[in-house]
Each structure stands twice: as structure tokens, then as C-alpha cells.
Amino acid sequence: MLDVKEITDSIFKLDKRIRYVAILNHQYGLVESRMREGVASLTPAQTDRDFMTLAAPLMVGSAEKLRPFCGAIRRLAVRYDKVLLVFYRTAAHLVVLSLEPHAEQALLDRIGDSVRKLELASGEGGAEKGE
């Protein structure tokens, strides 16, 4: 069974353009926050943590309000000049990645499929303890 750190390591192995991985539980509590080794963050660490715990619930929660009408969210992406942020909702977590800004659609699909498979392999396909 994979733990959160092993899932993060596996996500980094998917593509060298993945700069950062954050994993949040369904209450948007930050479980993991890690930059790729050797990659400099564009933002201070505290800003990253604040963004994940404040902005992620607002952005994803707002988008999920359309779920009954439009279906499940595959991913939510925000493209900045210098970085691409991608949010993937899984059964047990919200996985947030930052990538190099010109990542193509096919790569985002492949990463999303892999993130979901990794989580299933971890045995965390259901709700977390305490949720």
C-alpha cells in the first residue's frame, strides 16, 4: 500500500515538467506540499501553503457547484505566464500540481489518469479516517 509520500514521489516520476505537488484531504487540510528537488519555487513556501488552504477550497468548491448539472470535474486548470496549476479531484484527495506553463492537454489527461490510479493503488479510494 502506498502512503502519501510515495504517491507524491510517483507523481513526480510521471513527467519532468511537474514542479510541485500538493495533496489535500476533502476538508482541504494540507497533507503534503513538496517542490521537485532542484526546482526553485516561484512563490514563498508560506504563500504556497496559504494558497492551498484558502484558494483551493474557494476555486474547487465553486466549480463543484455545477457537478449535479455538468458531471464530475476531471480537472481544474489555471494557466499563469510562468506556471500552470492543475487541480485533480480523486476519491480521497484533491491533488494540486504546478507544471511548466506550456504543458499540453494530452499530458494533463495522462497525469490525471495516473493520479487516480495511484490513489486506487494506495487503498485510499474511500473517505479518509475522521471524515
Region locations from a protein language model:
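Non-catalytic interaction/Regulatory regions outside core domains
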Residues: 1-131
